[in-house]
Structures are given as C-alpha cells and as structure tokens.
Amino acid sequence: LLGCISALLISSQSFAETTMSQEGQYIFNSLGFYIGGVLVAFMAAGFCMLESGLVTTKSVSTIAAKNIGKFAICSLIFFLVGYNLAYGVPEGGYVGSFTIWTDSSDAETGYSGYSDWFFQTMFVCATASIVSGAVAERIKIWPFFIFAAIMAGLIYPISMGWQWGGGWLASGGFSDFAGSTLVHGCGGAAALAG
C-alpha cells in the first residue's frame, strides 16, 4: 500500500520530456544504424555457415576465405565508389556520382553518415553472400572477388540508388521494406546470372 501511494505521489510530481534534442536524436538514430548493421553482419555470417554446410568438406576453408575476402573487398569498394553512386542520384534519376565518399553529416542530418555507411555496407555484403551461396564450388575464388568488387561498386549501388537514393523508383512511389526487394532482388538476379 505504501508503495502504491509513493508511486502516485512521485508520478504526479514528475513530468516526462516530450521532445528529444537534436543531439539525442542523432545519437539514437546512429546507434540504431550500428545495431542494425551488426544484425545484418550476423545474417551474412549465417550465409557463410549455410554455404559451408552445403559444400564438400575439402571446400569449407575456401568458402570461409571467400566470405572473409568478400567482406573486405565489398567494404572497401563501397566506401570508395558505391556509397556516392547510391546516394548521389538526382531526384528521379538513374545513376549517382562516381566520387569518393566523405562524411558531411552533423546533428541536423539526424544520424551519422558513418553509421549509415556501415549499415549499407552490411547490406552490400549480404547481397554478395546470396551470390556466393549460389555459385559455391562452381567458381574459383579470384573471379568471385572480381565479381564482388563489381557488385559492391556498380551493380548494387545503382539499384539501391533507384529507391533509397531518391531515384526513379522512389519518385514513382515504390516502397521497399528493409531491403526485401533491393537486396534480395539484386542478389537473386546476380545469382541467377552466375
């Protein structure tokens, strides 16, 4: 009884803050991107484990090396070219700019550009993982690395820019939920071609 009375007294004297500062929004949005990126990275690691289970025992180490190398190559290429290619699309356009990305975000943008880059990089790696699983034991490692670089620097950023970068799909009212079309459609089409 005493606890209920004290809870009523305390709650009547306290006021909840209804708005959050720009800095608080920046921190929480950036943290959300980082957490989401880590979860997508675990998904890509799961693809590696699935792929390792689907191949013969002698190919498991090659599959693991292919997935680690894919992460390194995709991250570097997406940083150098892919991010600006995806987000540099003019409104209703098709292709962004071929420039090296620099983070120009501040508290007014609502999130850190690096957190968004990390999140999107994990999606690039997941897209390449779809292809990796489809061509397991049917492609040598170096041609796959070349393909992963092309996928991270050209193919995926262009299709990503059509929606998330404000391109022609976004202008047409297309709605994509968490990459269900962009990531899996692009990865599936590339896997089918492979």
Ranges and model annotations:
Residues 1-194:
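Hydrophobic alpha-helical transmembrane bundles of multi-pass membrane proteins
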